[in-house]
Structure formats: C-alpha cells, structure tokens
C-alpha cells in the first residue's frame, strides 16, 4: 500500500501539470545588420541628433506544440536620418539597424487567447530590453551616439491589433 507522502506527491504532480505555465527557456540573436551607407561623410554633417524611425514586428511559431515550446521573434528595424547641412530640406541616412532577437518559451495549459497574448505581449515585453541594449551597443560601435529605443507598450499594440 502506498504511503501518504507518495499519494500527496502524485496528486501534486498531476495538479502542477494542469496549471498554466509560461516559462522562458532561452533567448538569442538570430540576425543583426547595421549599415552606414553615407559614412564617413555623415559624421562631418551630423550636428543634431538624427531623426529615428522604428519599426517593430513580432512573429511566433510552435517549435514543439505537443510539449508547448514556442519561438518568439522580435523583429526591429531602425533607420536614422540626419539633415544635410548644405540642403536643410533634405535628409541622409545615417544608419539602418536590423535586429531579429528571439526567445524560446514553454507555454502550457492556456486558452488560445491567453496563448496569443503570451506570445504577442508577455514574451516581447521580456525580450525588448535585451534587444534595446544590443541596438544601443551596435550604434555606438558604428561611431554614433547610442540609440536608446523608447519602451514599447506591447499590450497596447496587441489591443489595437484586435480592434482592426
């Protein structure tokens, strides 16, 4: 006959297996590219901080759906433009930085809506500070001041996408 501790442990294990789970397993840089198409001339005409355009896309895919393993890709593209000192109405590209920063997550026992929110809100929120640091370091290494991206409200972006 099993003792009381074995019965309690089995019930606890079954209960834990049915609880919602969203756990990061790892994160990595899938790709990075930084282009400075107008260097070195751009450094001599740069008097003010550049105008920066940031594009952010999120992609996710099941790696092992049966075991709840998913990859989330934070795809960032930044383009910095500076005003040409000879033609103030014209701008020149200072740099373009493209980064795909990824995380692998184990996600179990969630509804489809909770899974979507985890993949499109919670996971990118966790990944963004690391991607931000990589972009700041890359732009510094390219000879520019560090580009510190403003935080992104992924919950708001998700809510807006649901209204469309």
Swiss-Prot record:
InterPro entries: SecB, SecB-like_sf. Residues 1-12 have a biased composition (Basic and acidic residues). Keywords: Chaperone, Cytoplasm, Protein transport, Translocation, Transport. GO terms for cellular component: cytoplasm. It comes from the Bacteria. It is found in: Cytoplasm. GO terms for biological process: protein folding; protein tetramerization; protein transport. Residues 1-22 are annotated as: Disordered. PANTHER family: PROTEIN-EXPORT PROTEIN SECB, PTHR36918. One of the proteins required for the normal export of preproteins out of the cell cytoplasm. It is a molecular chaperone that binds to a subset of precursor proteins, maintaining them in a translocation-competent state. It also specifically binds to its receptor SecA. Belongs to the SecB family. HAMAP family: SecB. Homotetramer, a dimer of dimers. One homotetramer interacts with 1 SecA dimer. This is Protein-export protein SecB. It comes from Neorickettsia sennetsu (strain ATCC VR-367 / Miyayama) (Ehrlichia sennetsu). The gene is secB.
């Amino acid at each position: 006959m099993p003792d009381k501790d074995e019965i309690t442990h089995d019930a606890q294990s079954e209960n834990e297996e049915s609880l919602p789970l969203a756990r990061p397993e790892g994160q990595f840089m899938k790709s990075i590219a930084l282009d400075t198409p107008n260097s070195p001339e751009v450094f001599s005409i740069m008097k003010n901080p550049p105008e920066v355009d940031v594009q952010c896309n999120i992609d996710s895919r099941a790696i092992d759906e049966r075991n709840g393993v998913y990859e989330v890709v934070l795809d960032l593209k930044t383009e910095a433009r500076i005003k040409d000192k000879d033609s103030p109405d014209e701008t020149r590209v200072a740099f373009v930085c493209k980064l795909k920063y990824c995380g692998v997550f184990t996600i179990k026992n969630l509804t489809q809506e909770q899974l979507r929110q985890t993949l499109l809100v919670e996971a990118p929120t966790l990944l963004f500070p690391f991607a931000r640091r990589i972009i700041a370091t890359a732009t510094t290494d390219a000879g520019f001041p560090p580009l510190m991206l403003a935080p992104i409200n992924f919950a708001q972006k998700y809510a807006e996408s649901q209204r469309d």
